[in-house]
Each structure stands twice: as C-alpha cells, then as structure tokens.
Amino acid sequence: MDSTKYESLSKYIRGNIQQWKKDSMKNCNYQCIFTGNKDFQIHHLYGVSNILNDIVNNYHIVIKNNINDYSKDELHYILNIFIKEQSKYPLGVCIRKEIHVLFHSLYGQYYNTPEQWYQFQKDYTNGIYDDIIKNKIA
C-alpha cells in the first residue's frame, strides 16, 4: 500500500493520540532511553502506517484525499479503531531526534516493526553506530 495515501489521516491521528504519547513518555521516564536527554521524539515500534494499513484492510475504511473530506463521526470512528489497534503493540520509545533519524535512515520511514527496533536497540547499545552519531549528540 502506498503510504502517501495515508498522509492526511496520519497527521490527524498523530495529533490525537495524546494518552499514548503520555504513557510512552512516562514509560521512558521522560527522557531518551539511550542518552537520558530530556529532548526527544517518540518512536512507534509498530509504525502508524502499519496500523493504518491494518485498519483500512480489516475495517474497510475508505481513504480520502483530504482530512476535511471526512465527517466528524468518521474521524471519531477511525481514531477509536486506531487507538484500539495501537494498544495491541508496545508503547513508543523516547529517543533523541538524531537517533530517530538514524533508525529511519536504516530501516525506512514506513512500515516499521518492533523486530527492527529491537535489532536497532541491540546494535546501538553495542556501539555499532558510534561513529555515525559521534558528532550529532551532545
């Protein structure tokens, strides 16, 4: 599935999953899990595009070109299904922007999985990426 089809809906959903974000930050003690820095982004272990693809296929959601093409009831329905599906997966992890960019440069921007994350976390912890990020993280 072409991930660009989901851009409008993805932006809407990302702006409306505050509880998941709060829970993810709390789970990471409000800091990057690698550096302890308080400046971080939240990485979805099971990507937003994966969840959107799942709910589009399983619930026969019609993808519209613009978020304004959905009714409030449709958006509420989609968001509730998304939150339900998202709860099946691990919370997000808090990581520095530079580390987040590194992950996606290695594994792509869309359709990421927990398995990719666990491999990245292992490699990061083992120093595999030290040379790449040496000058990017203070």
Model region roles, listed by residue range:
Residues 64-114:
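Short Cys/His-centered divalent metal-binding micro-motifs
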Residues 16-67, 98:
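Short cysteine-rich loop/turn motifs with clustered Cys
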Residues 4, 9-17, 48-52, 56, ...:
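Generic hydrophobic, helix-prone segments enriched in Leu/Val/Ile
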Residues 102-138:
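Active-site or metal-binding loop neighborhoods of secreted/extracellular toxin and effector enzymes
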Residues 1-39, 125-138:
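A boundary/linker detector
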Residues 3, 8-10, 24, 49, ...:
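Generic serine detector
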Residues 18-19, 31, 41, 86, ...:
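Residue-identity detector for glutamine
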